[in-house]
């Protein structure tokens, strides 16, 4: 509102000039907000690690998994967002799930609580390791404590506008750094295309098994419960009506486009720089080697500052987004509590306690002797796939309810894709179970 007021005052002086400025700046600002937040909530260590490990260990042979996962992410998040904007009763996505069967409310509450803890576990661990390396103190656990303390200082202080601006800068820096390195590496386009349409799982040749890496990519990209955080950022932006469907879709396309560029650049770095040099990504320092080999100490700083920025921003995003998701799921179970606080999470003491849980308890994974950052990241994103079948099947049912969606219910193409997503989810979960048990 403040921006609109300022522009209105300026119009009196130079209407033609301001009109052009308003069209450009206002359109950009209002079109690309939640998508930026979504990218950083999605991105973080999951994409960074899975793409680099896949590239360094298996070249481009698993590229088709990434392509499929990004397509599924767009379609799933678009359906989730459309439900939030267009359902006839003004339900949140989790309230919609609760309408299908009470099981969904209990499942989503427990699943979101566990995954909120686990996602922040490797994000905080990674941010602590990077901060420790930057300051050369060799105390990653203490650095993780500092990260959590800094996040506490940010939360609740006009957080959306501040974080959005910071995230745009960090995302741009990270993208430019990896994109520059990927272009410099002169990627083999033929191999990229071959890997994108290959549809095969290579034999295990890396530190981490090919099937585990593939499932981890699906979990990190397509099957992430972080996809459910997007509607809460939309609400903060003021996108709450069917009239916002188009701008939401454009915003989401922009977000997915950024994801494609970043993931592809990271993958190319792994395949063209790390793999030929026999470097397997077992620690975050192994990934830093790519920039250091090409850009020297400057590249080293760019990598660690950029990665710290993304990890830190992701911790903030998850620590504010997941509590909304968790409390919303609990409101599906306990409708009286929703009515008591009029559906306003921030007024509910539970929201604060859940935020503390999601932010503080993951520190146990940063204690010396716990699994390494890379292994933890791959493991958590693989485990994330367990909830994907429930999410995909529930979404397929919910988005076809004409009583709720009217003319905005799924078209035939979306139904085919969601059905395939459900099949992929069940296959991935079964494969993961047989791998471990």
Stretches with model-predicted labels:
Residues 104-136, 311-329, 372-378, 426:
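Hydrophobic transmembrane alpha-helices that form the core helical bundles
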Residues 21-24, 28, 59, 85-114, ...:
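Transmembrane-helix boundary/entry motifs in multi-pass membrane transporters
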């Amino acid at each position: 509102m403040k921006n609109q007021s300022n522009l209105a005052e300026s119009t009196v002086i130079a209407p033609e000039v301001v009109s052009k400025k308003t069209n450009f700046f206002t359109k950009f600002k209002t079109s690309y907000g939640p998508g930026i937040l979504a990218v950083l909530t999605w991105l973080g260590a999951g994409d960074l690690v899975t793409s680099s490990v896949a590239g360094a260990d298996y070249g481009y042979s698993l590229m088709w998994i990434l392509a499929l996962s990004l397509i599924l992410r767009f379609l799933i998040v678009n359906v989730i967002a459309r439900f939030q904007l267009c359902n006839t009763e003004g339900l949140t996505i989790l309230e919609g799930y609760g309408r299908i069967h009470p099981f969904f409310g209990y499942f989503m509450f427990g699943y979101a609580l566990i995954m909120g803890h686990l996602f922040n576990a490797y994000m905080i661990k990674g941010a602590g390791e990077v901060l420790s390396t930057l300051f050369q103190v060799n105390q990653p656990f203490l650095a993780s404590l500092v990260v959590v303390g800094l996040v506490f200082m940010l939360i609740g202080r006009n957080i959306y506008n501040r974080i959005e601006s910071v995230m745009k800068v960090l995302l741009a820096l990270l993208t430019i750094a990896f994109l520059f390195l990927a272009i410099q590496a002169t990627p083999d386009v033929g191999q990229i295309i071959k890997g994108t349409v290959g549809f095969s799982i290579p034999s295990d040749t890396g530190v981490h098994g090919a099937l585990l890496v593939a499932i981890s990519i699906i979990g990190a990209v397509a099957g992430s419960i972080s996809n459910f955080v997007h509607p809460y950022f939309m609400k903060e932006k003021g996108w709450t009506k069917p009239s916002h469907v188009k701008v939401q879709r454009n915003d989401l396309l922009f977000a997915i486009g950024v994801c494609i560029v970043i993931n592809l650049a990271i993958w190319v770095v792994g395949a063209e720089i790390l793999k030929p040099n026999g470097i397997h990504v077992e620690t975050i320092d192994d990934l830093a080697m790519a920039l250091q080999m090409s850009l020297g100490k400057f590249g080293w700083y760019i990598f660690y500052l950029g990665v710290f920025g993304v990890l830190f921003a992701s911790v903030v995003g998850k620590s504010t987004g997941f509590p909304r998701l968790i409390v919303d799921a609990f409101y599906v179970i306990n409708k009286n509590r929703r009515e008591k606080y009029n559906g306003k999470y921030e007024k509910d003491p539970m929201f604060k306690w859940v935020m503390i849980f999601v932010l503080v308890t993951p520190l146990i994974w940063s204690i010396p002797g716990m699994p390494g950052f890379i292994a933890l990241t791959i493991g958590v994103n693989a485990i994330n796939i367990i909830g994907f079948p429930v999410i995909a099947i529930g979404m397929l049912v919910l988005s076809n309810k004409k009583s709720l969606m009217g003319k905005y219910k799924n078209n035939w193409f979306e139904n085919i894709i969601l059905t395939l997503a459900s099949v992929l989810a069940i296959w991935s979960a079964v494969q993961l179970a047989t791998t471990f048990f």
